[in-house]
Each structure stands twice: as structure tokens, then as C-alpha cells.
Regions:
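Short beta-strand elements
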Residues: 388-408
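N-terminal beta1-alpha1-beta2 submodule of the flavodoxin-like/Rossmannoid cofactor-binding fold
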Residues: 856
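Extracellular acidic, Ser/Thr/Pro-rich low-complexity tracts
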Residues: 302, 859-861
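Glycoside hydrolase catalytic-domain context in secreted enzymes
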Residues: 1-388, 406-838, 842-852, 868-913, ...
Length: 937
């Protein structure tokens, strides 16, 4: 069966999603949508340089193009753009080019702005009917935002633009091309007529923004976060960014759960809020209850003058009981179809009370380590945001109900206090009270020893292949008895980055990563960074999709699922089995640099959006690796900062989205985090990965570490080579090693097996998890030649050659017949290693054979920086190598080139990220022997 990856349809769908996720916060006097023939002046350099995404691994998609707002407005033709002002900007940009930074995590949060004087604003106003001011921000992996000018706050230059433009123009629209929410106090200062968050909409973001501005799409986005008056109003700000210990003292009171319970007056724009160009009237049609399931029916009527969509949100207020609860919890949401003026739709929303059960981590209810519904009234509210929701009915429980019995797991070991509400008199908001957090009472070491598998068998090679398990001729357990201890150990190692065993430029290969494993018919699976598109560091292009925050703001999981069907097709086309995403960490604080990758401050919205992505990709036999499990809520010192969290907050907030993705989305690949939670680095946390994930949730997939993660034994510091706890915890794969067979990371798994800290049965258990993933993968189908679906392409603008410029020829070299071991210098005088640049050497080979291209280089960046170099011969990729930041130390990397024919060749280097200092580069002749063993050319 053939399926078609239609890139025009892909672009149209991504554009629609980006428009649907745009959030209109203000629209005075109906200034939007723009009207036909209006004259518009556009201010702010981001009008030309649209941020498609944030930075780091989640943003490194080589997009074939990125649309911007100004060109898209002119392409649309609805309005007349002030071309005099546009020309001034374009001339200024020639001397003030976009600053891409000096490498990994060195990109600036914002870009320098062209000064806008009172006179310039006045002149533009004389030629225009209204103004659009475009402001841009970015942040990302290894780089949090800051409560400073140019990041969370406006710069002085931006303040000047807004002040002068708003004074000169009667109508001003502000467009925010940002990954995170930002400080919004300037709205009160300057009073622009309209404010529109367009987030980071991928490569179609510019066109999508214009669709909203011109009314082709009525903005239906709703905030997936609460925008407070000030950054200090978020309770997590006090502890956010601590380099050593981050105490989650706000506990379960994150986002609107905090503000609606304790600080209603600190909210500028509430969770779930977003305006439309039309008006809707909502009417409750009743609340029906069957058991613990409540059904809300809400009639929505478009009483305005434009077609549009509305989102209905259901919140529940649970009785305070003995545990204390937030005054609102999102229980369900639904979005209408496109309603024409006068049209109506009845939405049926179902809310399961058991999903709102509270976890008793102290035993105060008499049911320690249980999820409970305490006795009392459960009040249902329905509205279009959390603040406007009105009561529609109540469900009364006469007595406490135990919903689920769990096991104490991952409780903190350090004492601290957490927030809980205290209500006094008739107040509709709580007073902050504090209580001691329950600490761990179980013996974790004893639990691990008691539960570890010990029975295993080694029978040697019986001639069975993994295909025999696939065809149900033998069991997986039988198959694994053939594998030696060394085979099982090698299987715990993923190879990368940019392993030549899988799709070029991708993050890792795993499964059959050694010759020995491949002899048993174990395929090599491939994963690639995401979540907003496929990252291929060799320069291969892929579609850049709207980012996580924008997707959540659509409140439309069906639309997101449809988009990720297309992503699934693209993954399959590129022979990639898993996208490293969605990212589903909670927006605990607006300053987290990777919030753009994640969805929301709410775990229910987060989980349902993640499930939608997984379902979409799953329709084409591929999947996503949900990440980062768990509490990856700051980037600063993310390798070592200890997240200290109550067990209740973990289960109700920070793990809940993952639980939904597993149970509703069918997740079968998960990535753990870099840092520790309650003293244990998550990559080796038994209670997280076995007790909760596998035993309680019934998870049957794989778990991989984040790239070059640390692991520890309790009470010890983290180490990249300490893999014994990793295997024991069922974190199945360490990501990544350069070579699995040689144990290039020098991990201690074999040592642990020899001294009894590990058993062969534990290794077999992890191998079984990996094989279960492989058995359902397209990699297995490809290996067996049974791939049923074939991908064809339509309208493809995507190149499989290197991205970036084609590169200037830096040197032309005639290579004399070299002797074995002879080194031939390549000149570096004109070489640029900036991100996206290409450099070409014209080489005339006079001797066939094997050569090594050797780089001697350094980087001032830290060890988590990822700096890829791709090498092409005559536009054919030879290999991509990735070095990590070396903190100034000189290192050596090499690429093997097999020259089978003499004559002239063009060797191109493509640098995927800035930050490399090249000290020396040369070709070394190795010889003619074994040339056929190399896959190059």
C-alpha cells in the first residue's frame, strides 16, 4: 500500500494549527481583523526574522523556509504595507544582521531593535491607518529565561517603540512572536488596541499570523498558562533557578491552582482565556451523573457577525477535607466546529471524578498511599476560561472513596514545608498555611533486593532469530536465553549522535548496535530529536512545526492528532522509528527556557495533548518518546540541581501528564531527565521507573536516558559511567555512546554483574523491554522485508542534501601520491564554523584508498553542547560527527573517506551549530586494504 506525503497539505495543516493556537488578549474597538485596503506600518525587526521555535535540540530543524509577517502580509494583499518604513528597516538590517550567538545555548533572548523616534512614528502615522508592532523572544535548552530586560521584560528600545508608536497612532496592534509568556504590565502603560500572542509557529508561522490578522482565521486560541501581574507572583519564583536544591514548596498549587485558590487579584489574564472576533453565548443544558462520571452538556451559539470556534472548559472544586485542595481543577474541555453567525452546537463533555482524586501521602485520611475522593460536595463549573466559569451543578459523596491503592514511592528524604490552604469565615479565597512534607518511610534498598528477578538461563546460540518471536514460533524469553552477558550489556547502550547505522544526522541508534546482536536478527532502531520537527544534523531538511505551547493553546487534540499524522509519515519516510517528543514537563514557572517545547501549567491539558500527538504518529507505525520523566522544570544546572518535591505533588502534577500519555495515548517510549528528584538521578530511580511507571501504570515500553545523563547510587554523586542503578531501575538504554561494543563510555555494568550488584535476569528484563519495542517497530518490518507501506512524495521542497549555503571553495589542492600515514594539511584561513555555513575544498586525488579527515578542535562551551559537522563528497553525505563542548580542551575527531576512483572531488563541510574553534584539519592516507568494507561512496 502506498501513502502520500503531500508537502502542500502538510504546510496548509501546520499553518492552520499555528493560526488556531494564536491567542487574542485584547481587541479594543474591533481593530482586528484588518480591513481590505487599510494602510499599515509595521515596526520591530521580528517582522522580517520570525522565530519558528526556541533553541537547543527542540529547535534544530533544518526547515526549507520560514515565513515572516511582512512578506506574508504583502503576499496576502488585504492591506497596504508602508513600504517607505519597510525600506528603512531593510537598510538598517544590513548593518545590524541577526545575531545567532556564539553556539549552543549562546543565542541571545532578543535582537537589537532599530530606534523608533517620535518623529519617525509621526511620519509613519501620517501615511498609515494603523500600526503593527512585532516583538520577538527566544530561549531553550541549557538557557532559561531571566526576569530581566530583553527576556521576560521589555528592553528600553522596545519600550521606546511602544511609547512612540502608541502615541502617534490611534490604533496599534502588538504581535508577540515568543516561546513563553512574558511580563505584560506594558499593556496598561501604553494601551495598545490589540495584543496577539502568536507564539512560535514553525515555518508557516508568518503566514498563520497573517491569516489571523486579516480574519481568514478567527483566533480561537486559549491561554495554556496563567499570566500574572508580576513574575514574583508565581509561587515557584522564590526557588526557581537554584543551582543545588529546588524546593517545590508550592506543592500542588501550580499555575491557576494557586491563583484561583490564594491570589485571584494577582492575575492579569486567566488560564483558558482568549478572545474571538465574534461573540458566543453559552447555555448550560444540565449536569448528569452516573457513578463517578459526570456529563455536562453546553449549548454554544454564535451571536456575533463572523464565523468562529469557541472552547468550553469544565472545572471542579473538590471539598477541602483533610488534605486540602485547589479551588479549581480542569476536568474536561471541548471545542466547537466552525460556527457561522446564528449557528449553535451542543457540546457533550465527560468528566471522571476518579481522575481528580487526591493522593494521601501522609495518611491523614486513614488511607496512606491511596488516591481518595473525600466526602462532600464536588462543584462543577463551566465557562470559557477558569475565571469566568459558572457553577452548573454538584455531586455529593456521603463518604470517602478509595479510588486506587498505590505504594509509597519517590517520597522526599529532606524535610521542608509545603503550601496548603486555610479558609477563614466566608472568604472565597484561602490564606496560605504551611505543613511539614511527609518523608520517605520505606527501605528502598530492601525493596529493590526483594523485587529483583534472579532466574535466568543462558543456553547459547540455538539458531533463533528475533523474527521467530515476531512470527510467534518461540517466546521472547526463549530467544533471550541465547544472548551472552556481553550481548545483553551491549544492548543497554545506544550509539550516537549521528550514528552511521541509522538515518544520517539523527540522535541515536539502539537495539542491534553490535555485529553480535545483529547476528540474532535484532534490528537497529533510530530516534531523532523533536518535538517540533525532525532534527537531522547532516543538514537534511524537514518540516518545522508549531511548538508545544501553541499546540496546547488550540485546545483541539483532534487537530493536533491530524498534524502529527503528517509528522508520522515524515518520520517513516526518513526511516526514523521515534521522535524525541512530545515534551510534557509542566510550566511550573514562566522562566523555564524549554517551556516552548512543553504544553501547559495544567497536567490534564498536557497529557491529552501528548496523547493526541502519539495517536497521530502511531497511525503510521512510528511513535514519540515522551520526555523528560520527570521534573525537568529549569535548565540552569539541570544536570545536578536536585528537585525536592512531595510525593503528592509528583503524582498529581508532575507525573500526571505522563500517566495520561501512557494510559490514553499508548506511549511506549519514555526519556528520563538529567537531574535528580529527591536525591536520586532519575535515570537510575527505581521507584520512578519501576514502582510507579511499570508496576502501577502497567507500562510496557522502553525507557532511555537523556543524552550523556548522570546516574547515582543513593547518597553518592551522579556519574555518566554509573550504569548499575540504571539497569536495576529498568532505564533500559543509556544514551549515548560512541561505540557500544568497546564500551567507549567505560560504564560499570559488567563490573556490577560480576560483583553481584546486578543479575543476568535484570539485564534480560531490560533486553526484553527493548525487544518489545523493536518487535512493533518499522525497523523490524524493514529488516524482514515486510514493510507494507511505501511512501511517495508530492510537491516536495525538501532537499536531502546539506542545508545552509552551498559554501565557497576555500582551497584547490592537488594531492600527490601519499605514503601511508602521510598527513596533508587543509588550509583554515577562510574557514567559518558558524551555524549553517558550508565550506568546500576542491581536491584532486591521485591515489585511491582509504583516507581519514582529521579535525583538531576545541569549544569553550560546556559538555552538553552539541556541535555537529557533516562531511560530503560530491554532495553525498559521508558522515556526521558530533562533538560536545570541551570547555577549551583540544580534542580530535575523524571521518573515514573511501576514495575508489582518482580524479577531482568536492569535499563540503557543513556546520550545524556555532561554537567550534578549528585548530587544524588534515587528510591522512591510511591505505588500500579493506576499502570495500567501507560504506562511503
Amino acid at each position: 500500500m502506498k501513502y502520500t506525503l503531500d508537502y502542500e497539505k502538510y504546510a496548509e495543516l501546520a499553518r492552520r494549527v499555528a493560526a488556531e493556537g494564536s491567542v487574542l488578549l485584547r481587541n479594543e474597538d474591533g481593530v482586528l481583523p484588518l480591513q481590505k485596503g487599510q494602510r499599515v506600518s509595521i515596526f520591530g525587526r521580528t517582522q522580517f526574522e520570525h522565530y519558528k521555535s526556541g533553541t537547543g535540540s527542540g529547535g534544530m530543524v533544518n526547515a526549507p523556509y520560514v515565513t515572516n509577517i511582512t512578506d506574508s502580509l504583502k503576499e496576502d494583499g488585504t492591506v497596504q504595507v508602508n513600504e517607505v518604513l519597510e525600506a528603512q528597516y531593510r537598510e538598517w538590517l544590513k548593518d545590524h544582521p541577526f545575531d545567532i550567538g556564539e553556539g549552543w545555548a549562546m543565542e541571545p533572548w532578543n535582537q537589537e531593535e532599530m530606534p523608533v523616534s517620535e518623529e519617525l512614528a509621526r511620519q509613519a502615522a501620517e501615511q498609515s491607518d494603523l500600526a503593527i508592532v512585532v516583538l520577538g523572544r527566544t530561549a531553550g535548552e541549557d538557557k532559561d529565561n531571566s526576569a530581566a530586560e530583553g527576556s521576560y521584560l521589555l528592553t528600553a528600545a522596545e519600550e521606546e517603540i511602544l511609547r512612540n508608536v502608541c502615541n502617534a497612532f490611534a490604533r496599534t496592534i502588538v504581535v508577540l512572536n515568543v516561546g513563553n509568556i512574558m511580563d505584560m504590565k506594558w499593556v496598561d502603560r501604553y494601551q495598545p488596541q490589540a495584543v496577539l500572542y502568536v507564539w512560535q509557529g514553525g515555518q508557516e508561522g508568518g503566514r498563520a499570523t497573517v491569516d489571523v490578522l486579516t480574519g481568514k482565521v478567527n483566533p480561537g486560541g486559549k491561554l495554556s498558562d496563567t499570566i500574572a501581574e508580576d513574575i514574583e507572583d508565581y509561587p515557584s519564583t522564590e526557588n526557581f533557578g537554584d543551582p543545588v536544591e529546588n524546593f517545590y514548596t508550592e506543592d500542588i498549587y501550580v499555575g491557576y491552582r494557586y491563583f484561583e485558590t490564594f491570589a485571584r487579584d494577582k492575575v492579569k489574564y486567566p488560564f483558558g482565556f482568549g478572545l474571538s472576533y465574534t461573540r458566543f453565548q453559552t447555555e448550560s443544558m444540565g449536569l448528569a451523573v452516573q457513578g463517578t462520571e459526570a456529563t455536562v452538556i453546553e449549548k454554544v451559539t454564535n451571536v456575533g457577525g463572523m464565523s468562529g470556534r469557541e472552547t468550553i472548559q469544565v472545572y471542579v472544586e473538590a471539598p477541602q477535607g483533610k488534605l486540602g485542595k485547589p479551588l479549581r481543577q480542569l476536568a474536561a474541555y471541548a471545542k466547537t466546529e466552525e460556527l457561522k453567525p446564528g449557528a449553535s452546537e451542543e457540546l457533550i463533555l465527560k468528566a471522571e471524578l476518579t481522575e481528580l482524586a487526591s493522593y494521601d501521602d501522609s495518611g491523614v485520611t486513614g488511607h496512606k498511599s491511596c488516591y481518595v475522593l473525600e466526602a462532600g460536595d464536588y462543584i462543577f463549573y463551566v465557562g470559557t476560561d477558569v475565571r469566568s466559569a459558572r457553577e452548573v451543578g454538584r455531586v455529593t459523596l456521603a463518604e470517602l472513596q478509595v479510588v486506587r491503592t498505590a505504594t509509597e514511592a519517590l517520597a522526599p528524604v529532606q524535610a521542608f514545608k509545603r503550601l496548603r490552604p486555610f479558609f477563614f469565615g466566608e472568604n472565597d479565597h484561602a490564606i496560605a498555611n504551611w505543613e511539614d512534607v511527609p518523608l520517605r518511610t520505606i527501605d528502598l534498598t530492601e525493596r529493590i533486593l526483594r523485587e529483583r528477578p534472579t532466574q535466568s538461563e543462558y543456553v547459547g546460540d540455538q539458531g533463533w532469530k528475533l523474527a521467530d518471536v515476531y512470527d510467534k514460533k518461540i517466546t521472547l524469553e526463549q530467544f533471550l536465553t541465547q544472548l551472552s552477558d556481553e550481548d545483553l550489556i551491549c544492548m543497554t547502550r545506544g550509539e550516537g549522535m549521528c550514528s552511521p547505522k541509522v538515518t544520517p544526522g539523527t540522535a541515536a541508534a539502539f537495539g542491534g548496535v553490535t555485529d553480535g546482536l545483529q547476528q540474532f536478527g535484532i534490528p537497529v532502531a533510530c530516534c531523532s530529536d523533536g518535538p517540533s520537527g525532525i532534527r537531522m544534523d547532516c543538514g537534511t531538511m524537514a518540516y518545522a512545526l508549531p511548538n508545544g505551547t501553541l499546540l496546547a493553546c488550540t485546545f483541539d487534540p483532534e487537530l493536533v492528532e491530524e498534524l502529527y499524522e503528517m509528522e508520522g509519515m515524515e518520520l517513516r519516510k526518513n526511516k526514523i522509528d521515534s521522535l524525541l517528543g512530545p515534551g510534557i514537563n509542566i510550566h511550573r514557572n514562566p522562566l523555564n527556557g524549554r517551556n516552548f517545547e512543553y504544553f501547559s501549567e495544567d497536567p490534564y491539558l498536557t497529557g491529552t495533548m501528548a496523547a493526541a500527538q502519539l495517536k497521530g504518529m502511531g497511525k503510521y507505525g512510528v511513535t514519540g518518546t515522551i520526555k523528560h520523566f520527570a521534573c525537568n522544570n529549569q535548565e540552569f544546572k539541570r544536570h545536578d540541581a536536585n528537585a525536592i518535591v512531595s510525593e503528592r505533588a509528583l503524582r498529581e502534577i508532575y507525573l500526571k501528564g505522563f500517566e495520561i500519555a501512557v494510559k490514553q495515548g499508548g506511549a511506549y517510549s519514555i526519556m528520563s531527565t538529567y537531574g535528580p528528584v529527591n536525591g536520586l538521578w532519575t535515570a537510575g530511580s527505581y521507584d520512578l521507573l519501576t514502582t510507579i511507571l511499570r508496576k502501577e501504570w502497567g507500562y510496557q515500553g522502553i525507557v532511555m536516558t537523556d543524552w550523556w545523563a548522570k546516574i547515582n547510587e543513593e547518597g553518592e554523586s551522579g556519574s555518566k559511567s554509573q550504569t548499575v542503578p540504571m539497569v536495576r531501575a529498568q532505564n533500559d538504554i543509556y544514551m549515548v555512546t560512541a561505540d557500544a561494543a568497546s564500551n567507549s563510555n567505560k560504564d560499570n555494568t559488567a563490573e556490577g554483574l560480576a560483583d553481584g550488584r546486578l543479575t543476568r535476569a535484570q539485564l534480560m528484563r531490560n533486553a526484553a523491554n527493548i525487544c518489545c519495542f523493536l518487535l512493533r517497530s518499522v525497523a523490524m518490518e524493514r529488516l524482514l522485508g515486510r514493510e507494507e507501506e511505501e511512501c511517495t512524495e508530492l510537491h516536495s521542497p525538501v532537499s536531502t542534501e546539506g542545508a545552509g549555503d552551498s559554501g565557497q571553495v576555500l582551497a584547490r589542492l592537488e594531492l600527490p601520491e601519499p605514503k601511508t600515514g602521510e598527513e596533508i594539511e587543509l588550509p583554515l584561513e577562510k574557514l567559518s564554523t558558524k551555524k549553517g555555513t558550508g565550506a568546500v575544498y576542491q581536491l584532486r586525488f591521485t591515489k585511491i584508498g582509504r583516507y581519514e579527515l582529521v579535525f583538531r578542535m576545541s569549544s569553550t562551551l560546556g559538555p552538553l553542547a552539541q556541535l555537529p559537522i557533516s562531511v560530503f563528497l560530491n554532495n553525498t553525505l559521508q558522515q556526521t560527527v558530533t562533538i560536545n563542548g570541551t570547555e577549551g580542551k583540544v580534542v580530535e575527531q575523524s571521518v573515514t573517506l573511501a576514495i575508489r576512483q582518482d580524479g577531482e572531488k568536492y569535499m563540503k563541510l557543513y556546520f550545524g551549530e556555532s561554537g567550534i574553534d578549528m585548530h587544524r584539519m588534515f587528510l591522512r592516507y591510511v591505505g588500500k586494504n579493506d576499502i570495500e568494507s567501507f560504506r562511503n561512496e
